[in-house]
């Protein structure tokens, strides 16, 4: 356990934007070779999410002699941006690497961990529902799957994991389709947060936002202001910056001001003018890619037949490892087992490992 050490998200600590807030190139960062980060040791967690431009910006802002420790799992999904930085650094063979393989919890304590390791090794997972935290519901109909999802969120899982409905996350491989994010979100919105008199709504493009909705910020915005207030409206803290993947609840839609107020973790409230609503999406269900780097008390994973190029081992492994207390997979057992065997994840043509080796020759 390490205490008294500063921790901070890279976009907050490193990517302090000057000028254009949409510019995430090195030229838009205040931290660089002329204004480096002041640290003796830098530890980067969830390193598999870091792409080439971000890694370049980080290294450009580090002074010689600084120790850098990268922590990550190459078996999870690669970064959204270009490159496979962590994988290439490891495969270069030029840096000391420690691989953690031992499960320190008792084997019977968490089948989430045991099954995640089986998936990672390509071994079949026993789906007999004798587990206390890993469940499989065999279904072959999309409407039945969604009905089960609603029941789990409204009645079963909140008590089972001692969490609110908002803490239960549906993770799906796709945005489109009968079990895609867009369709599931519209259905769950009507069941989990139905309209009623006095509950304000706002239509924006293809989206309908309603007070009480669970939403996600889908791009970095370094200029948006947030504040924390008391119940009497006194401001106790404030700052700027809302980041891709942040999740919150719509607390108020003010039709007079034309704003939508979202409350994020730590009671941070952000007031969005209507013209920034394209930065928000409903988040009852999100893609597995969007969930990378996050954890939830319970996750629900709907799985039926889909494109083989989207249904691969790393995706399933990432989804399962998002849960702290409970995983429920609903759908086809054959699709689940086939995903474990499908290692045909789209390969990225990178040359970082070779260039590192050449530099060290």
Where are the language model's segments positioned?
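ASCE P-loop NTPase helicase motor core
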Residues: 9-130
């Amino acid at each position: 356990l390490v205490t008294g050490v500063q921790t901070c998200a890279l976009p907050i600590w490193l990517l302090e934007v000057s000028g254009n807030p949409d510019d995430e190139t090195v030229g838009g960062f205040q931290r660089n070779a002329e204004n480096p980060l002041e640290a003796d040791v830098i530890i980067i967690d969830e390193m598999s999410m870091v792409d080439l431009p971000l890694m370049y910006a980080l290294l450009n802002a580090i002074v010689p002699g600084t120790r850098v420790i990268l922590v990550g799992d190459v078996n999870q999904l690669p970064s959204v941006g270009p490159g496979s930085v962590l994988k290439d650094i490891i495969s270069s063979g030029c840096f000391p690497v420690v691989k953690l393989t031992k499960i320190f919890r008792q084997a019977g304590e968490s089948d989430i961990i045991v099954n995640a390791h089986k998936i990672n090794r390509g071994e079949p997972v026993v789906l007999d529902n004798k587990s206390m935290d890993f469940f499989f519901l065999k279904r072959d109909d999309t409407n039945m799957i969604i009905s089960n999802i609603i029941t789990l969120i409204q009645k079963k899982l909140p008590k089972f994991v001692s969490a609110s409905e908002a803490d239960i996350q549906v993770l799906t491989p796709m945005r489109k389709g009968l079990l895609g994010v867009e369709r599931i979100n519209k259905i769950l919105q009507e069941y989990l947060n139905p309209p009623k008199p006095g509950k304000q709504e706002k239509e924006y493009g293809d989206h309908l936002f309603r007070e009480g909705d669970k939403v996600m910020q889908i791009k970095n915005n370094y200029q948006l202001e947030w504040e924390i207030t008391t119940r009497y409206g006194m401001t106790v803290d404030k700052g700027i910056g809302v980041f891709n993947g942040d999740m919150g609840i719509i607390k108020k839609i003010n039709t007079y001001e034309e704003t939508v107020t979202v409350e994020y973790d730590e009671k941070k409230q952000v007031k969005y003018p209507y013209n920034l609503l394209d930065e928000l999406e409903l988040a009852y269900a999100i893609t597995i890619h969007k969930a990378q780097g996050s954890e939830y008390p319970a996750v629900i994973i709907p799985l039926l037949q889909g494109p083989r190029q989207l249904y691969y081992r790393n995706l399933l492994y990432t989804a399962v490892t998002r849960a702290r207390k409970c995983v429920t997979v609903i759908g086809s057992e054959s699709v689940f087992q086939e995903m474990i065997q499908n290692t045909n994840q789209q390969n990225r043509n990178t040359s970082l490992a070779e260039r590192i080796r050449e530099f060290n020759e």
